[in-house]
Amino acid sequence: MNRVADVIRDDIKVMTAYQVADLPEGFIKLDAMECPHHPFAGYESLLSEWADLAKQAPIHLYPHAAKSGIYEELREVFGIPDKAEIALGNGSDELIQFLTMLVAKPNARVLGIEPSFVMYRHNAALYGMEYVSVPLNTDFTLNLPAVLSAIEQHQPSLIFIAYPNNPTGVCFKREEVEEVIRAATGIVVVDEAYGAFHHDSFLPWAGEVENLVVMRTISKIGFAGLRMGYAAASPSIMGELAKILPPYNMNQLSLAAAKFSLKHHQIIQQNIDTLKNERSRVMNELLKLNRLEVFPSEANFITVCVPDANGLFETLKQNRILIKKLHGSHPLLDQCVRITIGSAAQNDA
């Protein structure tokens, strides 16, 4: 008898742990959709205030998100309707996990549109739920008839739609997503992790449409290290979610830093605009190269189909540049790589 192995779930034993790339010193990191620098780089007075937060934060007390003022800042900056309630997560990953747990009844199903964010499928498996995968079209657009057919056939309790999509960068047509929301038999999560780089959002619908959850994160706009995601939805969903979320899942430093950052959202928007301009510039340069298929992007990365994804990945790595190799992760991503938009200097390297 093995006292450890014998008590661990068999389905977990065959899972693979999420691998974070080991980054040697001096590498240009274009693999994880992070911003290329501190969001307040160059603003010395703000950096000084930022540093003082650590001294002032009441780290001897448990955090109380509702009393921190973060909800009010989120509503003001992102236009979250008063009808919607807000939940915070230790990154969007935690919200995905608990939203999945919320509907994990026997025989319940999760529907995902793939290729997309791997944590949707992972959490469905973690809670013993059947995962219904609907492939995208070959140009990474939404196959709406297939999605509607899958909804009718499988009656999923939970549907995840990344808007814009990761890892493709393509944003589906809004009217198609609206049709999915109307057709759904359960909860629809519109994951807007990359919404800051797109011109459209479903946040105005949060609280108005009972079965809709709109999820966002501050990771992609310069604060990946704070690990804060947020969701907005109707009270009928959020009241139930509140029962299972850990009571102190956000730490005092993250709450204080996030609130401070949102007060200076104009600077954050300037950083976003700079990255969007760089995205256009890099896209135009890639389109000049032969034998590449460059997909349109509404995120802070560009997905490209190349003749030899493995060879390109290794060549760039030898030159101390790290990108994400998508090849092998899904049939539609054959010979694809994903390139995060960095600074102008990083992009020109």
Q: Where is each model-derived feature located?
A:
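Short hydrophobic/aromatic beta-strand micro-patches
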Residues: A232, T303-C305, T340-G342
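Hydrophobic "anchor" residues on beta-strands that sit immediately upstream
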Residues: L158, I187-V188, L212-V213
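N-terminal "arm"/small-domain region of PLP-dependent enzymes with the aminotransferase-like
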Residues: M1-A65, E73, Q155
